[in-house]
Curated annotation (Swiss-Prot):
This is Aquaporin NIP6-1. GO terms for molecular function: active borate transmembrane transporter activity; channel activity; glycerol transmembrane transporter activity; urea transmembrane transporter activity. A motif (NPA 2) lies at residues 250-252. Residues 7-23 have a biased composition (Low complexity). It is a multi-pass membrane protein. It is found in: Membrane. The modification Phosphoserine is found at S302. GO terms for biological process: borate transport; cellular response to boron-containing substance levels. Residues 1-30 are annotated as: Disordered.
Length: 305
Protein backbone atom coordinates (compact mmCIF):
# COMPACT_ATOMS: atom_id res chain seq x y z
CA UNK A 1 0.00 0.00 0.00
CA UNK A 2 2.95 2.29 0.57
CA UNK A 3 3.55 2.66 -3.17
CA UNK A 4 -0.04 2.93 -4.31
CA UNK A 5 -1.01 6.36 -5.61
CA UNK A 6 -4.25 7.58 -4.03
CA UNK A 7 -5.83 10.98 -4.77
CA UNK A 8 -6.26 13.25 -1.82
CA UNK A 9 -9.07 15.59 -0.92
CA UNK A 10 -8.18 19.23 -1.68
CA UNK A 11 -7.32 21.26 1.35
CA UNK A 12 -5.96 24.61 2.43
CA UNK A 13 -2.78 24.48 4.49
CA UNK A 14 -2.60 26.65 7.57
CA UNK A 15 0.71 28.09 6.37
CA UNK A 16 -0.45 30.35 3.55
CA UNK A 17 1.79 32.11 1.04
CA UNK A 18 1.23 35.36 2.93
CA UNK A 19 2.75 34.08 6.16
CA UNK A 20 5.80 36.20 7.11
CA UNK A 21 8.94 34.33 6.18
CA UNK A 22 7.16 31.89 3.85
CA UNK A 23 7.33 32.20 0.05
CA UNK A 24 4.64 34.53 -1.29
CA UNK A 25 4.17 32.49 -4.44
CA UNK A 26 4.31 28.92 -3.25
CA UNK A 27 2.16 25.83 -3.02
CA UNK A 28 1.79 22.56 -1.17
CA UNK A 29 4.73 20.22 -1.38
CA UNK A 30 4.49 16.85 0.34
CA UNK A 31 7.24 14.32 0.85
CA UNK A 32 7.84 11.88 -1.98
CA UNK A 33 8.64 8.23 -2.03
CA UNK A 34 12.37 7.74 -2.33
CA UNK A 35 12.13 4.96 -4.94
CA UNK A 36 10.04 6.47 -7.70
CA UNK A 37 9.58 10.10 -6.63
CA UNK A 38 5.80 9.67 -6.34
CA UNK A 39 3.57 10.85 -3.54
CA UNK A 40 2.26 8.04 -1.36
CA UNK A 41 -0.50 8.08 1.27
CA UNK A 42 1.90 7.68 4.15
CA UNK A 43 4.33 10.29 2.84
CA UNK A 44 1.50 12.81 2.60
CA UNK A 45 0.16 12.02 6.06
CA UNK A 46 3.61 12.09 7.63
CA UNK A 47 3.93 15.73 6.58
CA UNK A 48 0.91 16.52 8.75
CA UNK A 49 1.13 16.45 12.52
CA UNK A 50 -2.56 15.75 13.08
CA UNK A 51 -2.70 12.23 11.57
CA UNK A 52 -1.27 8.93 12.76
CA UNK A 53 -0.04 6.84 9.86
CA UNK A 54 -0.18 3.70 11.99
CA UNK A 55 -3.94 3.45 11.42
CA UNK A 56 -4.20 1.79 8.02
CA UNK A 57 -8.02 1.96 8.14
CA UNK A 58 -7.88 5.60 7.14
CA UNK A 59 -6.67 4.56 3.67
CA UNK A 60 -8.84 1.52 3.03
CA UNK A 61 -11.55 3.38 1.12
CA UNK A 62 -9.05 4.44 -1.54
CA UNK A 63 -8.99 8.13 -0.61
CA UNK A 64 -7.13 10.22 1.91
CA UNK A 65 -9.18 11.99 4.57
CA UNK A 66 -9.43 15.80 4.32
CA UNK A 67 -6.14 17.38 5.37
CA UNK A 68 -6.62 20.37 7.65
CA UNK A 69 -3.41 20.30 9.66
CA UNK A 70 -0.59 22.81 9.66
CA UNK A 71 2.25 22.39 7.20
CA UNK A 72 5.63 23.86 8.15
CA UNK A 73 6.94 26.60 5.83
CA UNK A 74 9.77 25.55 3.52
CA UNK A 75 13.14 25.77 5.23
CA UNK A 76 14.89 28.09 2.79
CA UNK A 77 17.89 30.07 3.99
CA UNK A 78 17.98 33.82 3.55
CA UNK A 79 21.02 33.48 1.28
CA UNK A 80 19.11 31.23 -1.10
CA UNK A 81 16.20 33.67 -1.11
CA UNK A 82 18.50 36.58 -1.89
CA UNK A 83 20.21 34.59 -4.63
CA UNK A 84 16.88 33.73 -6.23
CA UNK A 85 15.72 37.34 -5.89
CA UNK A 86 18.92 38.60 -7.53
CA UNK A 87 18.68 36.20 -10.47
CA UNK A 88 14.96 36.78 -10.94
CA UNK A 89 15.33 40.57 -10.92
CA UNK A 90 18.32 40.33 -13.26
CA UNK A 91 16.27 38.34 -15.78
CA UNK A 92 13.35 40.76 -15.55
CA UNK A 93 15.39 43.95 -15.93
CA UNK A 94 17.54 42.49 -18.71
CA UNK A 95 14.53 41.30 -20.71
CA UNK A 96 12.41 44.42 -20.32
CA UNK A 97 15.26 46.86 -20.94
CA UNK A 98 16.77 44.90 -23.83
CA UNK A 99 13.45 44.83 -25.65
CA UNK A 100 13.11 48.61 -25.30
CA UNK A 101 16.65 49.14 -26.60
CA UNK A 102 16.14 46.82 -29.56
CA UNK A 103 12.84 48.54 -30.32
CA UNK A 104 14.60 51.90 -30.54
CA UNK A 105 17.57 50.48 -32.46
CA UNK A 106 15.29 48.88 -35.08
CA UNK A 107 12.96 51.89 -35.43
CA UNK A 108 10.04 50.27 -33.65
CA UNK A 109 10.29 46.72 -34.97
CA UNK A 110 9.40 45.27 -31.57
CA UNK A 111 6.25 47.44 -31.32
CA UNK A 112 4.44 48.32 -28.12
CA UNK A 113 2.80 44.90 -28.02
CA UNK A 114 6.19 43.21 -28.31
CA UNK A 115 7.60 45.27 -25.44
CA UNK A 116 4.56 44.47 -23.30
CA UNK A 117 4.79 40.77 -24.10
CA UNK A 118 8.51 40.64 -23.31
CA UNK A 119 8.10 42.17 -19.86
CA UNK A 120 4.97 40.18 -19.07
CA UNK A 121 6.54 36.88 -20.07
CA UNK A 122 9.68 37.68 -18.08
CA UNK A 123 7.60 38.31 -14.96
CA UNK A 124 5.62 35.12 -15.52
CA UNK A 125 8.60 32.79 -15.95
CA UNK A 126 10.49 34.30 -13.02
CA UNK A 127 7.51 33.90 -10.68
CA UNK A 128 6.97 30.33 -11.82
CA UNK A 129 10.66 29.45 -11.45
CA UNK A 130 11.71 31.32 -8.29
CA UNK A 131 8.46 32.17 -6.52
CA UNK A 132 8.69 29.11 -4.28
CA UNK A 133 12.18 30.13 -3.17
CA UNK A 134 12.18 33.88 -2.58
CA UNK A 135 8.59 34.93 -3.19
CA UNK A 136 9.68 36.61 -6.46
CA UNK A 137 9.15 40.20 -5.37
CA UNK A 138 11.47 41.57 -8.11
CA UNK A 139 10.43 45.07 -7.09
CA UNK A 140 11.18 47.24 -4.02
CA UNK A 141 7.62 48.57 -4.14
CA UNK A 142 6.26 45.02 -3.76
CA UNK A 143 8.66 44.25 -0.91
CA UNK A 144 7.76 47.42 0.98
CA UNK A 145 4.03 46.94 0.44
CA UNK A 146 4.11 43.35 1.71
CA UNK A 147 6.14 44.40 4.75
CA UNK A 148 3.72 47.25 5.50
CA UNK A 149 0.84 44.75 5.54
CA UNK A 150 2.81 42.27 7.68
CA UNK A 151 3.09 39.70 4.91
CA UNK A 152 6.89 40.01 4.93
CA UNK A 153 9.35 40.70 7.78
CA UNK A 154 10.71 44.23 7.88
CA UNK A 155 14.14 42.94 8.90
CA UNK A 156 14.54 41.35 5.44
CA UNK A 157 13.43 44.44 3.49
CA UNK A 158 16.87 46.14 3.24
CA UNK A 159 18.66 43.03 1.98
CA UNK A 160 15.88 42.19 -0.49
CA UNK A 161 15.97 45.71 -1.92
CA UNK A 162 19.77 45.56 -1.98
CA UNK A 163 19.64 42.36 -4.06
CA UNK A 164 17.11 43.94 -6.42
CA UNK A 165 19.20 47.10 -6.90
CA UNK A 166 22.39 45.09 -7.50
CA UNK A 167 20.58 42.95 -10.07
CA UNK A 168 19.22 46.03 -11.84
CA UNK A 169 22.61 47.71 -12.06
CA UNK A 170 24.27 44.48 -13.22
CA UNK A 171 21.69 43.96 -15.96
CA UNK A 172 21.94 47.58 -17.08
CA UNK A 173 25.73 47.57 -17.40
CA UNK A 174 25.63 44.23 -19.20
CA UNK A 175 23.24 45.78 -21.71
CA UNK A 176 25.42 48.86 -21.97
CA UNK A 177 28.38 46.66 -22.90
CA UNK A 178 26.30 45.01 -25.62
CA UNK A 179 24.33 47.94 -27.04
CA UNK A 180 26.49 51.04 -26.41
CA UNK A 181 25.82 53.77 -27.52
CA UNK A 182 22.06 53.00 -27.77
CA UNK A 183 21.63 52.39 -24.01
CA UNK A 184 19.37 55.44 -23.78
CA UNK A 185 16.55 53.44 -25.35
CA UNK A 186 16.22 51.42 -22.17
CA UNK A 187 15.89 54.38 -19.83
CA UNK A 188 12.40 55.17 -18.58
CA UNK A 189 11.66 58.84 -19.25
CA UNK A 190 8.23 60.48 -19.53
CA UNK A 191 6.92 61.96 -22.76
CA UNK A 192 4.15 63.75 -20.85
CA UNK A 193 4.13 66.26 -18.02
CA UNK A 194 5.51 65.26 -14.64
CA UNK A 195 2.11 65.34 -12.95
CA UNK A 196 0.65 63.12 -15.66
CA UNK A 197 3.62 60.76 -15.44
CA UNK A 198 3.28 60.53 -11.67
CA UNK A 199 -0.45 59.80 -11.93
CA UNK A 200 0.05 57.09 -14.56
CA UNK A 201 2.85 55.37 -12.65
CA UNK A 202 0.77 55.51 -9.48
CA UNK A 203 -2.27 53.98 -11.18
CA UNK A 204 -0.48 51.16 -12.97
CA UNK A 205 1.49 50.32 -9.80
CA UNK A 206 -1.83 50.23 -7.94
CA UNK A 207 -3.18 47.82 -10.55
CA UNK A 208 -0.12 45.59 -10.29
CA UNK A 209 -0.04 45.41 -6.51
CA UNK A 210 -3.79 44.83 -6.22
CA UNK A 211 -3.42 41.69 -8.35
CA UNK A 212 -0.17 40.58 -6.69
CA UNK A 213 -1.74 40.87 -3.23
CA UNK A 214 -4.73 38.82 -4.35
CA UNK A 215 -2.81 35.89 -5.81
CA UNK A 216 0.00 35.92 -3.24
CA UNK A 217 -1.83 36.33 0.07
CA UNK A 218 -5.41 35.12 -0.39
CA UNK A 219 -5.77 31.33 -0.48
CA UNK A 220 -9.11 31.70 -2.29
CA UNK A 221 -7.51 33.46 -5.27
CA UNK A 222 -6.10 31.54 -8.24
CA UNK A 223 -2.72 30.91 -6.62
CA UNK A 224 -1.54 28.32 -9.16
CA UNK A 225 -1.94 30.94 -11.89
CA UNK A 226 -0.09 33.68 -10.00
CA UNK A 227 2.62 33.99 -12.63
CA UNK A 228 0.13 34.26 -15.47
CA UNK A 229 -2.07 36.75 -13.62
CA UNK A 230 0.81 39.04 -12.66
CA UNK A 231 2.44 38.77 -16.10
CA UNK A 232 -0.84 39.67 -17.79
CA UNK A 233 -1.22 42.68 -15.48
CA UNK A 234 2.26 43.89 -16.42
CA UNK A 235 1.40 43.54 -20.12
CA UNK A 236 -1.84 45.47 -19.65
CA UNK A 237 -0.08 48.27 -17.75
CA UNK A 238 2.56 48.65 -20.47
CA UNK A 239 -0.14 48.89 -23.13
CA UNK A 240 -1.81 51.59 -21.02
CA UNK A 241 1.17 53.72 -20.04
CA UNK A 242 4.11 52.53 -22.14
CA UNK A 243 4.08 55.38 -24.68
CA UNK A 244 3.70 58.00 -21.93
CA UNK A 245 6.05 56.88 -19.13
CA UNK A 246 7.64 53.62 -20.36
CA UNK A 247 5.46 51.94 -17.69
CA UNK A 248 8.15 51.31 -15.09
CA UNK A 249 6.02 50.17 -12.10
CA UNK A 250 9.32 49.30 -10.47
CA UNK A 251 11.98 51.62 -9.02
CA UNK A 252 14.81 49.26 -10.01
CA UNK A 253 13.54 49.04 -13.59
CA UNK A 254 14.37 52.74 -13.73
CA UNK A 255 17.37 53.01 -11.40
CA UNK A 256 19.81 50.57 -13.03
CA UNK A 257 19.42 51.83 -16.62
CA UNK A 258 19.49 55.45 -15.37
CA UNK A 259 22.85 54.84 -13.69
CA UNK A 260 24.28 53.03 -16.72
CA UNK A 261 23.12 55.75 -19.13
CA UNK A 262 23.79 58.63 -16.69
CA UNK A 263 20.27 59.89 -17.38
CA UNK A 264 18.29 60.81 -14.26
CA UNK A 265 15.51 62.81 -15.87
CA UNK A 266 12.36 62.76 -13.71
CA UNK A 267 13.77 59.85 -11.74
CA UNK A 268 11.92 60.95 -8.60
CA UNK A 269 8.64 60.06 -10.32
CA UNK A 270 9.76 56.48 -10.86
CA UNK A 271 11.15 56.10 -7.34
CA UNK A 272 8.09 57.41 -5.48
CA UNK A 273 4.93 56.79 -7.53
CA UNK A 274 5.34 52.98 -7.77
CA UNK A 275 5.89 52.65 -4.01
CA UNK A 276 2.86 54.80 -3.16
CA UNK A 277 0.71 53.02 -5.74
CA UNK A 278 1.80 49.61 -4.44
CA UNK A 279 1.00 50.54 -0.84
CA UNK A 280 -2.48 51.76 -1.75
CA UNK A 281 -3.11 48.80 -4.07
CA UNK A 282 -2.15 46.24 -1.42
CA UNK A 283 -4.17 48.05 1.22
CA UNK A 284 -7.21 48.24 -1.04
CA UNK A 285 -7.25 44.51 -1.71
CA UNK A 286 -6.86 43.82 2.00
CA UNK A 287 -9.97 45.94 2.65
CA UNK A 288 -12.20 44.49 -0.07
CA UNK A 289 -11.27 40.79 0.16
CA UNK A 290 -13.66 38.33 1.78
CA UNK A 291 -13.20 37.92 5.54
CA UNK A 292 -11.57 34.65 6.53
CA UNK A 293 -14.62 33.52 8.48
CA UNK A 294 -16.98 33.89 5.51
CA UNK A 295 -18.29 30.69 3.97
CA UNK A 296 -16.96 29.70 0.57
CA UNK A 297 -19.19 30.68 -2.38
CA UNK A 298 -21.75 28.02 -3.21
CA UNK A 299 -21.19 28.13 -6.95
CA UNK A 300 -18.28 26.13 -8.29
CA UNK A 301 -15.14 27.97 -9.28
CA UNK A 302 -12.97 27.19 -12.25
CA UNK A 303 -9.71 27.46 -10.32
CA UNK A 304 -8.85 26.72 -6.74
CA UNK A 305 -5.71 26.99 -4.63
Amino acid sequence: MDHEEIPSTPSTPATTPGTPGAPLFGGFEGKRNGHNGRYTPKSLLKSCKCFSVDNEWALEDGRLPPVTCSLPPPNVSLYRKLGAEFVGTLILIFAGTATAIVNQKTDGAETLIGCAASAGLAVMIVILSTGHISGAHLNPAVTIAFAALKHFPWKHVPVYIGAQVMASVSAAFALKAVFEPTMSGGVTVPTVGLSQAFALEFIISFNLMFVVTAVATDTRAVGELAGIAVGATVMLNILIAGPATSASMNPVRTLGPAIAANNYRAIWVYLTAPILGALIGAGTYTIVKLPEEDEAPKERRSFRR
